[in-house]
């Protein structure tokens, strides 16, 4: 017996061969198996119950496809691994620090194997049956097709992979890298191998079958008072003290007719003995038979077994943990699993038919059995050239494409984002992390801030930090346009300048259509006067103006004017003709020459009418011609006036000169031109109010420099610019103007620079959330998309989202990326946010899990954030290395301490390295506590 036990593992498998396109593993009883490695399609904590149902349907489809005489074995291996990331030698200091911080961090890896096994014929000798062999390969192919059709990632294992898989299972070693075998020592409680033990926990005690009466493919976990869909056994990813957990799930599909007859006979036996227990048993069996008749389900034999590897002294807490978690699911695991070695061997890959039917298997419906199958995978990194690293819910770095449009999987149409998070939610820390990673991947970033949140990272990357002050105000010349910009992109500039002028002139009020028309015309003519100075109207322009003014004149004509004009024409006809000198005739307009000719002809015709010798028909014809000529003379007199008016207009335009482009010259141009337009068009416009309101930005005004100083052209070449305008955030006039011209700077930069560009506006965006700016903001967002850009706004005020239609229409509706941080402070009004952002029930549930999980152990400061890209959303952790924290910090005390180290060591990188080394050497104090000590001594720690 002892000799037999020593060689017990030798007879597990008969053969491993590659045949007919499949690697087939034969058990000792001749049962062939093919092994797929798959990825469970449901991401842990996705909160979407429908995904669990869909995977349940896929597994049910596979069972129906393979049918009787087959077993489906699924093994989910949850093994502790050590994190490693290959960092390029030329990586930035903060990036190297980031991955060094996570190096070696323990995490749970999930690998899933799906094993299809054909039952061997029960006989003394194993015989080759070509039909069964072909059927086996056909079922493997159909299973492959189902997984492909349902978009479940999978692959068949090769020969070496199957061999390694079986050997690793025997050694129970699934950590990456080499592994070795060691001796086994079996007992009734567990198997001992080296310094670890392996224990089996069958989910079902065959003698009692303590399972819930109703079961679903998922369960609900209570988080913040909300039921969140999760896997029935999701707790397996967090079994304490374990280094490896294998959840072995086996379903055998027996002959259905034989089992049905057996159940029907059993129901009759129970019915023949009329006592309460038999009536209940009969009712249960009949319910099962009814289900089988109605639904596409089958009777199956099952075994579910959890194998755990842990130190010998941790068996009790591991057992207690599993029993508690299973009890919460309504499952009482077997307490009589004394056949530990047998259970371990039965769980080997391809051993789906090795279980003892007397005490290892229980009978149930296939739909119920599949509810116990593990369905989750952990969050994975995305395939994308633009990588933004966050952590998953267990603290493992994963990269995503934060734009949603640059990765292999396209999720968005634009990369614009909207971020909301209350004070203290980690909003600025998160944005610092995003900006760092964008900068390190060749993105030009322009930021508008109102609280020095980005001073540290701007200094680290040698960016340009422009802070507004009275001594050095932020000043630009938004009116300056190059000839090329004027010819190619004047429409955009014109709309921006209109928004700027109305922001000053009207504030938050809508401009009237007349005001919009006037300002639009002055801007167009202003640039036309600069780039194409006016000399004279062309013939075609004159004719067009003539027709326009003629229509306007007729529009205002009335009967009295007509009568008066006709009387005047009669006087001219009846007045004695004056002889004109030849030189004066040469100076006449064509219309004047025609007028004189018509008058002479009318006089001749009048003489004919008065001639007694003329016949009546001649007189009538002459009278008709006179009336015709008089109408022409009437029109001709209007044309003469119009021609003179056009001459006057021509002279006015000739006098309008623009020598340089600036607000000053536009102001002068507009004040001269607007009265001319209003007089011509006969419209009203309060030019005095307009002049008075804009005067403060004009020559000699308090804010003259704001719109009349050329911006440093070198700014367009800067990779990172931060505009800090906290000192004017309460100025209702200057604040929105400065924000607006900064946005214009970004648009110019975006057109000039190649590659990715990002404009991020923190709380300052509220300055431009006015009705007059709605169209411009929409335009900005749409234009950014065309030039490989990102426009983002960040806010912490709930009312900004709920109460502003501009936010919804101009910003949210044009932002395919939405970012939310902890929303518990907004819980009472969360329905309003959800409605405006268009959140689904699943997305709401995801948001409720932010910072609500018990996942802080062994991790430093971090906050969680919900990111939605198109329809794809998830919760991520924002956890950074200490070096990154020092670079991002917005705490004044910490910034002052860092400046002391900077003064000592010369470079910010060296200062960050030394201050973090000293903090750890001083006992790993909190950042703020250590900073206080540094500030107290006013010197670096080595000099204390």
What positions do the PLM features span?
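P-loop NTPase motor domains
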Residues: 49-65, 331-332, 344-398, 404, ...
């Amino acid at each position: 017996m002892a000799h037999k036990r020593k060689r017990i593992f030798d007879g597990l498998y008969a053969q491993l061969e590659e045949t007919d396109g499949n690697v087939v593993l034969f058990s000792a009883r001749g049962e062939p198996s093919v092994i797929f490695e798959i990825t469970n399609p449901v991401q842990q904590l996705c909160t979407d119950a429908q995904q669990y149902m869909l995977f349940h349907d896929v597994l049910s489809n596979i069972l129906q496809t393979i049918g009787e005489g087959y077993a489906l074995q699924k093994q989910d291996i949850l093994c502790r691994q050590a994190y490693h990331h290959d960092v390029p030698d030329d990586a930035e200091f903060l990036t190297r620090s980031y991955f060094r911080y996570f190096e070696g961090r323990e995490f749970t890896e999930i690998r899933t194997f799906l094993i299809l096994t054909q039952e061997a014929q029960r006989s003394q000798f194993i015989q080759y049956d070509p039909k069964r062999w072909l059927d086996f390969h056909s079922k493997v192919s159909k299973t492959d097709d189902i997984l492909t059709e349902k978009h479940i990632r999978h692959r068949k294992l090769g020969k070496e992979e199957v061999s390694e898989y079986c050997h690793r299972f025997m050694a129970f070693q699934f950590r990456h890298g080499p592994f070795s075998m060691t001796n086994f020592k079996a007992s009734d409680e567990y198997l001992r191998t080296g310094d670890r033990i392996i224990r089996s926990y069958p989910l079902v005690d065959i003698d009692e079958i303590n399972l819930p009466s109703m079961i679903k493919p998922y369960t609900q976990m209570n988080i913040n008072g909300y039921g969140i869909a999760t896997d029935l056994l999701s707790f397996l990813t967090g079994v304490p003290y374990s280094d490896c957990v294998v959840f072995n799930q086996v379903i055998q599909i027996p002959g259905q007719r034989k089992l049905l007859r057996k159940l029907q006979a059993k129901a009759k036996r129970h019915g023949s003995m009329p006592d309460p227990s038999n009536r209940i048993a009969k009712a249960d069996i009949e319910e099962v038979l009814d289900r089988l008749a109605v639904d596409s389900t089958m009777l199956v034999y099952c075994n579910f077994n959890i194998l755990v590897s842990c130190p010998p002294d941790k068996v009790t807490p591991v057992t207690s943990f599993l029993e508690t978690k299973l009890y919460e699911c309504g499952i009482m695991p077997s307490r009589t699993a004394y056949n530990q070695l047998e259970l371990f061997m039965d769980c080997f890959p391809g051993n789906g038919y090795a279980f003892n039917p007397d005490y290892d298997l229980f009978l149930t419906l296939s739909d119920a059995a599949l509810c116990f199958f593990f369905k989750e995978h952990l969050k994975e990194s995305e395939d994308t050239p633009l990588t933004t690293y966050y952590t998953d819910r267990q603290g493992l770095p994963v990269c995503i494409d934060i734009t949603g449009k640059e990765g292999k999987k396209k999720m968005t149409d634009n990369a614009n984002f909207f971020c909301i998070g209350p004070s203290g939610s980690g909003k600025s820390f998160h944005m610092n992390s995003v900006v760092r990673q964008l900068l390190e991947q060749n993105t030009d970033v322009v930021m508008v801030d109102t609280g020095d949140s980005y001073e540290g990272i701007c200094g680290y990357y040698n960016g340009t930090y422009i802070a507004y002050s009275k001594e050095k105000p932020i000043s630009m010349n938004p009116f300056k346009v190059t000839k090329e910009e004027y010819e190619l992109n004047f429409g955009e500039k014109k709309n921006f300048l209109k928004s700027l002028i109305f922001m000053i002139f009207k504030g938050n009020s809508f401009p009237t259509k007349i005001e919009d028309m006037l300002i639009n015309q002055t801007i167009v003519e202003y640039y036309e006067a600069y780039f194409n100075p006016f000399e004279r109207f062309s013939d075609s322009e004159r004719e067009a103006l003539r027709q326009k003014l003629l229509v306007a004149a007729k529009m205002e004509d009335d009967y009295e004017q007509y009568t008066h004009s006709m009387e005047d024409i009669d006087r001219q006809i009846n007045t004695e003709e004056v002889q004109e000198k030849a030189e004066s005739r040469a100076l006449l307009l064509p219309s004047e020459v025609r007028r004189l000719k018509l008058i002479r002809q009318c006089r001749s015709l009048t003489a004919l009418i008065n001639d007694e010798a003329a016949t009546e028909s001649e007189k009538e014809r002459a009278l008709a011609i006179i009336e015709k000529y008089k109408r022409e003379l009437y029109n001709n007199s209007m044309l003469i006036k119009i021609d003179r008016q056009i001459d006057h207009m021509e002279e006015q335009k000739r006098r309008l000169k623009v020598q340089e482009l600036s607000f000053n010259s536009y102001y002068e141009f507009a004040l001269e031109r607007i009265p001319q337009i209003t007089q011509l068009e006969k419209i009203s416009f309060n030019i005095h109010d307009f002049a008075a309101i804009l005067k403060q930005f004009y020559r000699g005004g308090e804010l003259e420099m704001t719109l009349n100083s050329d911006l440093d052209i070198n700014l367009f070449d800067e990779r990172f610019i931060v505009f800090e305008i906290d000192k004017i955030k309460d100025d209702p006039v200057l604040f929105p103007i400065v924000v607006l011209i900064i946005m214009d700077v970004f648009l110019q930069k975006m057109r000039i620079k190649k590659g990715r560009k990002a404009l991020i506006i923190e709380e300052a965006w509220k300055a431009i959330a006015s009705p007059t700016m709605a169209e411009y903001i929409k335009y900005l967002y749409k234009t950014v998309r065309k030039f490989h850009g990102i426009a983002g706004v960040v806010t912490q005020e709930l009312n900004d989202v709920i109460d502003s239609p501009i936010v919804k229409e101009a910003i949210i509706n044009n932002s395919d990326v939405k970012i939310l941080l902890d929303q518990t402070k907004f819980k009472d009004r969360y329905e309003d946010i959800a409605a405006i952002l268009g959140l689904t029930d699943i997305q709401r549930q995801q948001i409720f899990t932010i910072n609500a999980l018990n996942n802080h152990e062994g991790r430093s400061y971090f906050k969680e954030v919900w990111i939605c890209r198109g329809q794809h959303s998830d919760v991520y952790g924002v956890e950074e290395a200490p070096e990154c924290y020092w670079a991002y910090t917005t705490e004044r005390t910490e910034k002052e301490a860092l400046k002391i180290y900077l003064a000592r060591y010369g470079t910010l990188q060296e200062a960050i390295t030394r201050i973090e080394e000293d903090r750890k050497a001083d006992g790993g104090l909190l950042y703020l506590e250590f900073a206080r000590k540094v500030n107290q001594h006013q010197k670096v720690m080595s000099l204390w």
